[in-house]
From Swiss-Prot:
Family from the record: Belongs to the MnmG family.
SUPFAM superfamilies membership: FAD/NAD(P)-binding domain
Originating gene: mnmG
Protein's GO biological process: tRNA methylation; tRNA wobble uridine modification
Keyword Nucleotide-binding attached: no
Keywords in alphabetical order: Cytoplasm, FAD, Flavoprotein, NAD, tRNA processing
Protein name: tRNA uridine 5-carboxymethylaminomethyl modification enzyme MnmG
Keyword Cytoplasm recorded: yes
Lineage: Bacteria, Bacillati, Bacillota, Clostridia, Peptostreptococcales
Amino acid sequence: MITYNGGNYDVVVVGAGHAGCEAALATARMGYSTMMLTMSLDAIAMLPCNPSIGGTGKGHLVREIDALGGEMGLNIDKTFIQSRMLNTAKGPAVHSLRAQADKTRYHIEMKKMLENEPNLHLLQGEVVDIIVEDNTVKGVVTKTGAIYYGKAVILATGVYLKSKIFMGEVNYESGPNGLFPALYLSEKLKALGCNMRRFKTGTPARIHKDSIDFSKVSVQIEDEEIVPFSFMNEALEKEQIPCWLTRTTEETHRIIKENLGRSAMYRGDIESTGPRYCPSIEDKIVRFSEKPSHQIFIEPEGAETKEMYIQGFSTSLPEEVQVQMVRSVIGLENAIIMRPAYAIEYDCIDPTQLKASLEVKHINNLFSAGQFNGSSGYEEAAAQGLMAGINAVLKIRGEDPFILDRSEAYIGVLIDDLVTKGTNEPYRMMTSRSEYRLVLRQDNADLRLTEKGYALGLVKEDRYERYLLKKEHIKNEMERLKTTNVSPTIANPVLERAESTPIKVGMSLYDLLKRPELTYENIKEIDGTRPQDLMKDAQFQCEVMIKYEGYIEKQLRQIDQFKKLENKKLREDIDYNEIDGLRIEARQKLNAIRPLSVGQASRISGVSPADISVLLIYLEQKRRKKGEVE
């Protein structure tokens, strides 16, 4: 191949999905020239599967991205067509915002943002090779022979590496939605010593809206009050588009069971691992054979299209079987398929080869993010992209990496799980993965992370001022609630209506709000000094902090214990073979993962509590020797 110098940049980002977009915007906004290469400019921030952002655990990630100065939250606030808060019957720790996206507008708005970023250059092209000299990345080579040099390179290749589509007996090399696959980069990465693996995911069919019998399906109404994803938006008003709910039938299950032998997964054509928490419909029917039916959600793909997404109905069965299956579902008897379902298989890296900064351990200045790292989902990808972008800049500057631990953010949980434990299937974020979810709520992501984003230069002055104002409102309101007392004469009529125990002596509003049956709203008439300009976010924070005070304090004590082990740092160059007392498996795992702290070491599969005790003794001996020398 004849090559030529395409240009020199501080950072080269490979891929323009959700990881690539956040990575490129972060590096450019931090003042570094960035080249962003993508297989197709028409697929920037594409939503190839579910047309939604957020959901359980994922909504937390979007809020954290926003708090750090990322773009995903702002973009979905501009382009959503329906918004719902999930898990509202449970406590605030698991409340998760989810928005149905207009997928075309989502792409357009994100592309516009990238095009208008001064330090960012967008280019359509396929990267086929990576230049590495002396274990340090120097740039990338495209299919047309252009070499783009960079001080750091971020791989955000999504599901495109050697990607292959499966529909029954039919399979062919392709990216999602009929786009080109990237067929060459995987082998180059293997040659550079990267341990690659094969994962799979899938997407359901899209059907024509006019072919649905809406009289037979249930409408799923949106929330009246729209809660924005971005902390920069106080309130949003928009006419929303509903989703619908239906169910499979006995006939659906019969068709699937009779054709299981034609499923690419059950035929054995697909040997890779799929996402546990997003199984295909044939997998659900085999695994849960006792269930007479399964829920199916029908979701619009946008305001200007009649394509409808059938959530919960992904499959790798042949196209003609898909037609029968879809038409056996209640309300879809005359459904017309516009895009058939398919499974897609792709290459990704074993994430235990990455540092917590998302830098590849054996190749300096090469970072990676998103589905390439073994995760699933747009939100997980965007979170990693943001962190990879930040850390690429910090590496160029010669500064320490920016790492969030498990007690600081869901982003910290996500990355720690990937690089410490690895994953044998596409990793999905859920609230249950966090040990400290009462502290890591989606509503307080700005209070946890905005200060950090500001220090990095990603949070601009207007956002920072809004954050400071919210903090001040919370502080002042908490003080007011503690010092404002109400008498039994005033309080008891309100308490009676709320079926709350009457009081015999005066009580502060703070103590009244501790009662689970009382809310900010139903004590309004006995709260004569409530500020009229109190921010809604601040009001919510106060109520949560008061009601869950004891639980939060308990979790903060647990975090203090967690931090003690996290603060016991381990050098990256330790030879664990030389530490007496470690078991062979522990030595192998510790040498492979190279944890940054005793806390991280304790989370590695195969490292026992006894091994951790050995490490603590080793560190104490090192500390004493250092003290004696000094």
